[in-house]
Each structure stands twice: as C-alpha cells, then as structure tokens.
Amino acid sequence: KKVVASKIAFKNAVYEMGHNIDPKRIVTFPSGIIDEDTLNSHLKYKNRKDKCLIYFKKRPSGDLEKVTNLLKDKNIDYEIFHYGQYANKDLIRSALNSKFGIFMSRPETQGFAAQELLSCNIPLIVWDQKTNYYEDLILSGTTMSYWSNDCGLMVDTFEELKFQLDVFVENLHKFQPINLIKEHLTYEKFKKNLKYEFEHF
C-alpha cells in the first residue's frame, strides 16, 4: 500500500509526530485543483480593478485590522473573504477581477483556497505562519504549501508586509502565479502522477 500526501503532511507525520510509517510507503504530490482548459481561460482577464482581495482564515483579528488600516492609508480598495463565510464562485469572481491579494491563514497541508486564487493569476502577498498547533503538539508548517517566485511575495511579519507593499504593487506585471498551477496543480498533472505511481508500484 502507498499513501498520497502533501509534503508538509509527510514531514509532520513521519518526522515530527512519531507515527510508525515507512517513508517509502508515502508518495508526496498535491491534488489537482483545476482543469487545463479552465485555467487557460483565466488568462483573458486583463483589465482588473485597482482592488485588493483579502483572504482571512483563523488568524488573530488584529492581523486583519492592521492590513485593512494599511490599505486604507494607501487608498487601496479591498474585499475581504472570511473562511467559511463565502461562496466559492464569489471568491473566484473577485480573484479574476482584482489586481492583487493578501493571504492570511493558519498553516495548511495543501491550501485549496490559496491555489484557487493562484489559478486566477492574481499575485499574492502571503503573511506566512510557520508554526502549526495540533492538539498538544507544536509542528512545523506554512500558510502556502506550494509556492514559487512567480506567485508573489511571502512575508513573516506585518512590518515586512508594510515595507514591501509599494514595491510589490509597482511590479505586479512581473508575476505569473498561473505558471505554478500549470506545472503542478492541474487535474491532468494529478492524473499523470497517479498513473506513474501505479506503473512503478
């Protein structure tokens, strides 16, 4: 038997939680989140509004307040999506029509919402959280489990976010988050990975 897991779940289970699992039995690759045709259709969205999409999941409310106050100071419009309080179609609609996003979440194993945003080719600033509290355990983690420099900017503190924001916004044209999705996260890529594992079992 083999188990398919994300890289961070593999690290947590095998090396940090002490589970008696043979690492050779675990295959690490992500689930697909979109088909290639739909992904390519997202490239047509060019005339985006000067607006920031904020995604907020299980973080201190003070973190959100700091970010919204910063955007207000810079006269940047924003739309907030709170985890569990939105329809997915509305998140996608906003992502396809916003210039950039700020993503704040607890650590994720794969992070489907983040990847759906990236599939809309919206550059993100991710305020990362690297510690995952699970029951009585303290595990390593990250807010963004799959990432590349094409996707945007990863920061560890609000101070860093504040310092980097202007330069990030001025250089949005340099980012192509959709490249990461094409390479790793389409349904077609997932099918190819599964087929390979079955053929080399």
Description of each model-found segment:
Residues 31-91:
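Conserved catalytic-core segment of nucleotide-activated headgroup transferases in glycan assembly
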Residues 106:
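Aromatic "clamp/platform" in nucleotide-sugar-dependent glycosyltransferases that forms part
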Residues 1-25, 62-63:
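A short, active-site helix/loop in glycosyltransferases that binds the activated sugar's phosphate group
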Residues 101-102:
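A short hydrophobic beta-strand element within the catalytic core of glycosyltransferases
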Residues 110-184:
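Catalytic binding pocket for nucleotide-activated donors in carbohydrate/polymer assembly enzymes
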Residues 9, 26-39, 132:
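Short beta-strand->alpha-helix junction loop in the catalytic core
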Residues 167, 183-201:
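C-terminal alpha-helical cap of glycosyltransferases
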Residues 93-98:
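Short alpha-helical donor nucleotide-sugar binding micro-motif in glycosyltransferases
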